[in-house]
């Protein structure tokens, strides 16, 4: 069974965490960063990119790079604001009124759930790589103010990514889990969550392992990106006044403005003024145009006054629903990177009257809480009870277009509520149930989650039939509605999908497409890695050949060097032709050839360590002879002689007595063996004289050595081990070599 992880699917960045050893831990991605940009792109070659790689092509390829997808999940096209639709890529409406993302590179459209699924799959693969085992389940966080269709769309995204979504968890609730896990005292916590695209406020009571949500509120169309857009509009208006060009009409210029605005917002959190320089932002027929300006913190805060007012309303509503006063709050936990802005922190101080707690990492705390919830579901974390609430009221439409609420907002979940309804006309045999979510009194002002019909009602006067409608919300916040005719017992149950979410058939099709594309991506990745390995091996082989040439000379292992050079040429040719099969064969051949060369190099190094000073002389002699190195090493022994031939200086192996060599005058007994001096064979005592025919008095000359068949002195010398071109050493001057029969030239005793 695979692991269950916690995932914070954010508008700007996403984070994944897991329980390890009873403690939550954030997993870094392949780039070594703990947060992954929530960006998906398609390169010009058709490769799908997720995360930092996709973010890098935002400026150069804006139409095929998709960011801020979370704002489109589970929403109809008519529900989007103009600011939400102002993105560098194309967002269109499909025939059903849902949102579709256009990808010109692939000539197809994506649902927001599909794009979100690519991000989730990327995070799951990173976790699998780190853990060494597959990730099959996940707890995914959503803003607390997400409605039912948005939650269902998030669940669909997880299914498309191949994950079993164990729980849909509210982000403020997850943050409270991470904050209060080790706390045993009772506290009232206010979680202020300002992310990239959403804003939530939740009030919780934490103590003794119980996390009870008292109230929640928020705005799903308010986040840090809205602060960026204020800077973008300010820059664009300034440039329009100065140059008469609206940069917002140029996709690349707009993306550069967005990146510059985000950078300026981050810098203004630490400094009071920042410079914005965008050279070559656009060009006219005459010259290129540059954008250079300066933005102060006070100017930035003045641009965002209305956004701060929008944050005050959910904050006050959450306190009111929890029936608490600001002084009743014990701790304020800031969640989301946008809470680092000084004006946001000052807003919290002014409304709550308490300094915000900044001990937690606002970028990672939600994912850590999701991992804790995953540990609770897996049984790794015990003695933790989480009581969440539904963020919005649920009900149905009645006569006159009025909404009848069955489950008020901030009701603890899971929950089941029922009510009895009747027909509006005489002899009515069918009832249509219209499910709504929201806080407005009239049905048209609320979110429509879906409709279904209950048929087979017996004809009866108006108001006589009794239809029991039940709303059931599970721990994930997913709504299930059932209608029961109490007269006939006929019942119909439906899980609300939401008008803007995908059908089951579409989800299954997208799951197959995602798996197919994932397989194609794996194959493409393997192909790229193979080419990288080939290029790396080529560079290593060429460097190795250069090193061996410098260390051992150009003639060392010449055949193996030629084999490697030939294989390198073949490998480069296969790389140029993109021949994968030939590439595999050439890679294996080059690896084998390089291994053989390294083996011979290692053997030569071992021999050099044993032979020391004489090895360079041996190499010189071998190069003069033109012999192969290995044959040369095999045929020469440690004494410098041929190990396959008998030692010509070994008298015990000669069949013909050697009489020509006179050693009786010297106290040294034949110390020369090859060119070396052998100390152990040196004796200071004279040899016994050769017995003569005169009774051993030494007056009779010995038998001379026969001339025929006797080699000359130079021919009888063994080859020199040091490969020197100098003539071999001659015997000591006190000795004579009986070279002939001339008695006048010979010396006798």
UniProtKB/Swiss-Prot annotation:
The gene is dnaK1. PANTHER family: HEAT SHOCK PROTEIN 70KDA. Keywords: ATP-binding, Chaperone, Nucleotide-binding, Phosphoprotein, Stress response. InterPro entries: ATPase_NBD, Chaperone_DnaK, Heat_shock_70_CS, HSP70_peptide-bd_sf, Hsp_70_fam. Residues 643-653, 661-694, 711-724 have a biased composition (Basic and acidic residues). One of its GO terms (molecular function) is unfolded protein binding. This is Chaperone protein DnaK 1. HAMAP family: DnaK (MF_00332). Gene3D superfamilies: 3.30.420.40, Actin, Chain A, domain 4, Substrate Binding Domain Of DNAk, Chain A, domain 1. Residues 643-749 are annotated as: Disordered. Induction: By stress conditions e.g. heat shock. The modification Phosphothreonine is found at residue 198. Residues 740-749 have a biased composition (Acidic residues). It comes from Synechococcus sp. (strain ATCC 27144 / PCC 6301 / SAUG 1402/1). Belongs to the heat shock protein 70 family. The keyword ATP-binding applies. Acts as a chaperone. It holds the Pfam family HSP70.
